[in-house]
A protein has these predicted regions:
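Acidic, polar low-complexity linker/tail segments
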Residues: 8-29, 108-157, 166-170, 482, ...
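Solvent-exposed loop/turn segments at secondary-structure junctions
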Residues: 121-123, 162-167, 214-218, 469-470, ...
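Acidic, Ser/Thr/Gly/Pro-rich low-complexity segments that form flexible
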Residues: 222-602, 619, 623
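MIDAS-like acidic motif and immediate structural context at the N-terminus
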Residues: 35-38, 42, 149-177, 181, ...
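…and closely analogous acidic/polar surface helices at protein-protein or active-site interfaces
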Residues: 49, 166-207, 381, 389, ...
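Short amphipathic secondary-structure patches
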Residues: 2, 47, 51, 61-123, ...
Length: 660
């Protein structure tokens, strides 16, 4: 006899008992008492089974998501989810449940995984209690659902320090920091690539870009014709180092410069085929020439100029034998580095637009600083000018020799000098000097699909090719890391910025503080710094209130007329703080790594704090010191721990691809 039958029989006996009022009262009261007891017991059991079903449902959802990310077939995912669900039902009979799995229908960047479970609950006492009051026995069925949004795609920019100090040995190792970094970075790429290769149904599941940085960032010389570069000299920083008024029609009517609507143009027949085209840094690279070879003409003489006129033409000369035919070639080509845009565009992903010239990117062109590299202008073995040294480090050309007593500033900015032809056999510039000075890194490698072996190898080859040289400008590296994963120009390989199911991540590693080199030259050309991504700090930006670009939008803690290395570092730190906030507000996940920085060193401590503040919060880990807060995506690494730290980064990135 079942529980309900036993209960019914007991109640029946009381109902038929005629032995006094006690029996009658007992019969009257036992019915609601037993019904209440049945309801209490069954309700508690119902809540327990419902709770266990929900727990099993959540666990099955996470397990199914992992199978989808790993590339399992639809049928295998559903079977795995069912098995996982039933295994976690604890004391519930799987026969009383049913699981429905709805797979994502978007395999190119996310989607929603939905699991619904129905539970049929068989109460213990409620059916009998219902019969006692004239009701009918029944089971209870309820359904619960759980949804997980899959993040199937990932775009990662590796922003890696290539400054000179990366050639130092990593602490606790006998290896150079740059070599330790190469190994760790390639290991990270391999780990994520292996996971990506298992995702058969998803296009470009994991992509990596590489941004080597030092004093500047190299976007690549192949972009010299792109529309996001300033092709017409419209940017307000395009000509800040140049004085085109020195090329006036009065000085040379055949070859002069004219400004029209903010753009300088080539005027006069002396420009040849490029007449009436804009004067830009690109045009300067194209127009500077050097005599790179010569061939003797038999039985010949040549005319050698002894005295020049003010316009550069010969006044007196003599004949000398033999005569040579000289071959000229371009002196230098743009290597690919760009200057930082003026605020606010230096700390943003704003799309370059010719209607807003300050948004355009300008190629770096390090001016020839005061001092004449060669003194013999006519190859006769006799110096035509007297050398003047200003102790500048980037003296790679001759100053215009036909002005009496020029100042250092005039020597540096007089544009006529760049159209002199460098004589055959004249002194060469020192290594690293020239218009590409401070451009020391290899070009950016844009996003590559590392699920494809060939593209994965491109990233790894670019990592291997890194070489340390130059200062440290973390914000420029970070800004370009952001731009490589963005869908906005210049680099448009990233998925749409608004696409759900895709994470954009920038991993930044540096081994030191931000640096911008100061120089003591107040009595010379007033450069105040070496030339780098922010140009010379001695120059002010138009409309900024006489502030140099590096100091724009900085706090009162930054002395606006303090031209020291420490003040430059503080200014770069503030630029980085603003940039980090902007990137994170644009849903960029920022991970930062400090390499061999000591918390007990004041300078290192500032760099550590800045990097930690820049980093995003982890979505999965808690702060070990305060479990109520998320952990920061920051690693204070040493040379000895770098490999393990990058494994932790790989784990964090792997988790991003499962659920959000």
């Amino acid at each position: 006899m079942g529980r309900a039958g036993m209960l019914k029989a007991i109640v029946g006996e009381f109902r038929h008992d005629r032995r006094g009022n006690y029996s009658l009262m007992t019969a009257i009261t036992i019915v609601p008492l037993m019904a209440g007891l049945a309801l209490s017991v069954d309700y508690g059991e119902l809540l327990r089974q419902k709770h266990e079903t929900l727990n099993a449902l959540d666990a099955a959802g996470l397990a199914a998501a992992q199978q989808i990310v790993a590339g399992a077939s639809d049928n295998d995912v559903k079977a795995y989810a069912k098995t996982f669900f039933e295994t976690n039902l604890a004391r519930i009979d799987p026969a009383n449940t049913a699981l429905t799995v709805t797979l994502p229908n978007n395999n190119a960047g996310g989607g929603t995984l939905k699991l619904c479970a129905s539970l049929t609950f068989h109460p213990y006492f409620l059916p009998a209690a219902s019969l006692l009051i004239g009701g009918t026995a029944s089971d209870t069925t309820f359904t619960e659902c759980s949804e997980l949004r899959l993040k199937n795609t990932l775009e990662v920019a590796l922003v890696l320090d290539n400054s000179g100090s990366m050639s130092d040995l990593g602490s606790g190792t006998g290896e150079k920091r740059i070599n330790l970094l190469k190994s760790a970075a390639k290991q990270l790429v391999d780990t994520l690539a292996l996971q990506a290769q298992q995702m058969k149904q998803i296009t470009k599941p994991v992509q990596f870009s590489l941004v080597p940085f030092a004093a500047s960032v190299n976007v690549g010389p192949t972009h010299d014709q792109d529309g996001w570069m300033d092709q017409d000299g419209m940017s307000p920083i395009q000509h800040e180092d140049f004085d085109w008024t020195t090329m006036s029609a009065a000085n040379n009517p055949d070859k002069y410069a004219e400004k029209l609507n903010g753009v300088w143009y080539k005027r006069g027949t002396g420009w040849g085929e490029t007449k009436d085209q804009p004067l830009t840094r690109f045009s300067l690279y194209a127009d500077m020439t050097v005599e790179s070879g010569r061939e003797e003409v038999p039985n010949s003489k040549q005319y050698v100029c002894d005295t020049y006129k003010k316009n550069g033409t010969c006044q007196y000369g003599h004949w000398s034998a033999p005569e040579y035919i000289y071959t000229t070639s371009r002196y230098a080509s743009w290597q690919g580095c760009v200057e930082a845009r003026p605020y606010p565009y230096n700390v943003s992903d704003t799309t370059p637009d010719t209607t807003a010239p300050a948004t355009l990117f300008v190629p770096m062109f390090a001016p020839d600083e005061a001092g004449t590299l060669w003194l013999d202008f006519n190859r006769d073995g006799i110096n035509d000018v007297i050398g003047t040294s200003y102790n500048y480090g980037n003296n790679w050309w001759a100053d215009w020799p036909y002005v009496a007593g020029p100042t250092a500033s005039q020597r540096q900015s007089d544009m006529r000098k760049y159209f002199l032809v460098k004589p055959y056999g004249s002194q060469s510039a020192a290594a690293g000097d020239g218009p590409n000075s401070s451009c020391t890194t290899n070009p950016i490698t844009p996003l590559k699909d590392v699920s494809q072996d060939a593209e994965k190898q491109e990233i790894k080859d670019a990592i291997d090719a890194m070489a340390p040289n130059g200062n440290t400008n973390v914000p420029e590296g970070l800004a370009w890391g952001w731009r490589t994963v963005s869908s906005n120009p210049p680099f448009t390989d990233g998925r749409p910025n608004s696409e759900r199911g895709n994470d954009k991540v920038v991993v930044v590693l540096t081994d030191g503080a931000n640096t911008y080199s100061a120089v003591s030259d107040g009595s010379y050309a007033n450069n105040r710094s070496t030339y780098a991504a922010y140009g010379y700090t001695g120059l002010t930006y138009p409309g900024s209130g006489s502030v140099t670009r590096l100091f724009m939008n900085t706090s009162t803690d930054i002395g606006k007329t303090t031209y020291t290395g420490a003040n430059y570092t503080a200014a770069l730190d503030e630029q980085m703080k603003t940039l980090c906030a902007n990137a994170k507000n644009s849903n960029i996940l920022v991970m930062t790594v400090a390499l061999d920085l000591s918390p007990t060193d004041a300078s290192d401590k500032k760099a550590i704090d800045a990097l930690k503040a820049c980093s995003s919060d982890s979505r999965f880990r808690k702060d070990s010191a305060d479990p109520s807060k998320p952990a920061k995506l920051f690693w204070n690494a040493t040379g000895a721990t770098l490999s393990d730290n990058f494994k932790e980064i790989a784990n964090e990135l792997s988790n991003l691809r499962i659920v959000g």
